[in-house]
């Protein structure tokens, strides 16, 4: 024993290195063990749903998964197969997995896809935007858009996950919670933005549109990867050296919020009325005064024009802060002032990379149901629509309130109902 301790003392550098390696290895193994426990618990919970008997005249739910293997730097396929796929199969659903090979493929596949009971998106913001756009571009979108959508956050940017699921620092738990939310079946309606250019078909967004200097600097962060934790500040610092002040000139026309209609009552099966009642109803509708004669004049929409000079403009939905009790539906137009200093640009820009909802002090926010953004010719630059880059051009943006139903964590849904946004 004495020889053992003497050896450790004489080789203290190797001992220290070995102890550090052993500690790290133990921590890594413990983390893997905890992840396996989370997966097992989630699978057991899903199996309860899979063991439930279905009525003889009912069919097994069909779920179509759109998986983007390239998401999360190529790790999405492994993350899905280890953490989400077993839960979906154990839940009793008939699961079909479609792996996308190139950008835009999901949109094309959805135009040809037959009916399904559930649509599941396994990827990030870009994959989700493709699927939503594909759904809403269909000729039968009025009925097809009623199919609930599940979102399994596998990408580097998954903005909607904060709205639909509880916060979690553990990647495995976050994925299993999102998958279990699909199995449990609780849904929440979300707004959609329809963004239409002059020539192309409309694009649909769940989060919003950004145009400005903060966005331009943020997309260049990966270029300075070799600077490690300083890469975000470096991207914004070098952006200030090219041009200052950085202003974006444009004009915007918009209309105010619209009144939210009451929730439609749940459809309940009713007995067919007797032949006598049906004849009376037909006669009453035949002799009734035409509806056009009773219609009242609808006041025309009031459009307001704003000339703006901004460092960044954003047009966003309220999906990040849902308020089920709100009496109005609107999108937010945020115009950030172009009078900030270089130091504030670097500081605030670094924070906006992690939290795009953050705004500069003095930002003007407008509420609208639709708007038209006009950009001067030759302005250049790019839009960021749900974290995907598009060429900047004049666009019409229209809010489609509560257009799509998304699966959400029951705990999160209960929190929305009991603690509405102020």
Swiss-Prot record:
Location of N6-acetyllysine modifications: 6
Gene Ontology molecular function terms on file: acylglycerol kinase activity; ATP binding; ATP-dependent diacylglycerol kinase activity; ceramide kinase activity; D-erythro-sphingosine kinase activity
Class of the enzyme per the UniProt entry, highest EC level: transferase
Induction summary: Overexpressed in prostate cancer, suggesting that it may play a role in initiation and progression of prostate cancer, processes in which lysophosphatidic acid (LPA) plays key roles.
Spans annotated as Disordered: 249-271
Membrane topology: Peripheral membrane protein
Keywords: Acetylation, ATP-binding, Cardiomyopathy, Cataract, Disease variant, Kinase, Lipid metabolism, Membrane, Mitochondrion, Mitochondrion inner membrane, Nucleotide-binding, Primary mitochondrial disease, Transferase
Region annotated Hydrophobic, chain positions: 15-31
PROSITE patterns in UniProt: DAGK (PS50146)
Classification via SMART domains: DAGKc (SM00046)
Catalysed reaction, written as an equation: a monoacylglycerol + ATP = a monoacyl-sn-glycero-3-phosphate + ADP + H(+); a 1,2-diacyl-sn-glycerol + ATP = a 1,2-diacyl-sn-glycero-3-phosphate + ADP + H(+); an N-acylsphing-4-enine + ATP = an N-acylsphing-4-enine 1-phosphate + ADP + H(+); 1-(9Z-octadecenoyl)-sn-glycerol + ATP = 1-(9Z-octadecenoyl)-sn-glycero-3-phosphate + ADP + H(+)
GO biological process entries: ceramide biosynthetic process; glycerolipid metabolic process; lipid phosphorylation; protein insertion into mitochondrial inner membrane; sphingosine biosynthetic process
Cellular location(s): Mitochondrion inner membrane; Mitochondrion intermembrane space
Pathway: Lipid metabolism; glycerolipid metabolism
Domain of life: Eukaryota
Gene Ontology CC annotation, any one: mitochondrial outer membrane
Tissue: Highly expressed in muscle, heart, kidney and brain.
Keyword Nucleotide-binding among UniProt keywords: yes
Domain DAGKc per the UniProt entry, residue ranges: 58-199
CC cofactor: Mg(2+)
EC number(s) from the headed UniProt entry: 2.7.1.107, 2.7.1.138, 2.7.1.94
Function noted in UniProt: Lipid kinase that can phosphorylate both monoacylglycerol and diacylglycerol to form lysophosphatidic acid (LPA) and phosphatidic acid (PA), respectively. Does not phosphorylate sphingosine. Phosphorylates ceramide. Phosphorylates 1,2-dioleoylglycerol more rapidly than 2,3-dioleoylglycerol. Independently of its lipid kinase activity, acts as a component of the TIM22 complex.
UniProt similarity note: Belongs to the AGK family.
Subunit structure: Component of the TIM22 complex, which core is composed of TIMM22, associated with TIMM10 (TIMM10A and/or TIMM10B), TIMM9, AGK and TIMM29. Interacts with SMIM26.
Clinical note on disease: Mitochondrial DNA depletion syndrome 10: An autosomal recessive mitochondrial disorder characterized by congenital cataracts, hypertrophic cardiomyopathy, skeletal myopathy, exercise intolerance, and lactic acidosis. Mental development is normal, but affected individuals may die early from cardiomyopathy.
Name of protein: Acylglycerol kinase, mitochondrial
Organism encoding this protein: Homo sapiens
């Amino acid at each position: 024993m004495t020889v053992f301790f003497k050896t450790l003392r004489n080789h203290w550098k190797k001992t220290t290195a070995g102890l550090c390696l052993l500690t790290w290895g133990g921590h890594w193994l413990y983390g893997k063990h905890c992840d396996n426990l989370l997966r097992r618990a989630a699978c057991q919970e899903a199996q309860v749903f899979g063991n439930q008997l279905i009525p003889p005249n009912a069919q097994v739910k069909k779920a179509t998964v759109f998986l983007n293997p390239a998401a999360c730097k190529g790790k999405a396929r492994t993350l899905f197969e280890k953490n989400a796929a077993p839960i979906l199969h154990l839940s009793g659903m008939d699961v079909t997995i479609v792996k996308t090979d190139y950008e835009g493929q999901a949109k094309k596949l959805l135009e040809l896809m037959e009916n399904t009971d559930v649509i599941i998106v396994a990827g990030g913001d870009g994959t989700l935007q493709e699927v939503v756009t594909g759904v809403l571009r269909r000729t039968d979108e009025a009925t097809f858009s009623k199919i609930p959508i599940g979102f399994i956050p596998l990408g580097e940017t998954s903005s909607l996950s904060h709205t639909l699921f509880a916060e979690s620092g553990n990647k495995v738990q976050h994925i299993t919670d999102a998958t279990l939310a699909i199995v449990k079946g609780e849904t929440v309606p979300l707004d959609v933005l329809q963004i239409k250019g002059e020539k192309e078909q409309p694009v649909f967004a769940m989060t919003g549109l950004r145009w400005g200097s903060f966005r331009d600097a943020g997309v260049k962060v990966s270029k300075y990867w070799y600077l490690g934790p300083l890469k975000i500040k470096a991207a914004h610092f070098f952006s200030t050296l090219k041009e200052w002040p950085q202003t974006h000139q444009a004009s915007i026309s918009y209309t105010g919020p619209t009144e939210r209609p009451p929730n439609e009552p749940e459809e309940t099966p009713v007995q067919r009325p007797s032949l006598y009642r049906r004849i009376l109803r037909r006669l009453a509708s035949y002799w009734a005064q035409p509806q056009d004669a009773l219609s009242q004049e609808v006041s025309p929409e009031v459009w307001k024009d704003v000339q703006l000079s901004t460092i960044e403009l954003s047009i966003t939905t309220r999906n990040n802060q849902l308020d089920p009790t709100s009496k109005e539906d609107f999108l937010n137009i945020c115009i950030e002032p172009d009078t900030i200093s270089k130091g504030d640009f670097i500081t605030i820009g670094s924070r906006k990379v992690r939290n795009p909802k953050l705004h500069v002090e003095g930002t003007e926010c407008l509420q609208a149901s639709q708007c038209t953004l006009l950009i001067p010719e030759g302005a250049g630059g790019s839009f960021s629509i749900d974290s995907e880059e598009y060429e900047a051009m004049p666009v019409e943006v229209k809010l489609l309130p509560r257009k799509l139903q998304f699966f959400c964590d029951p705990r999160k849904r209960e929190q929305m109902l009991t603690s509405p946004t102020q």
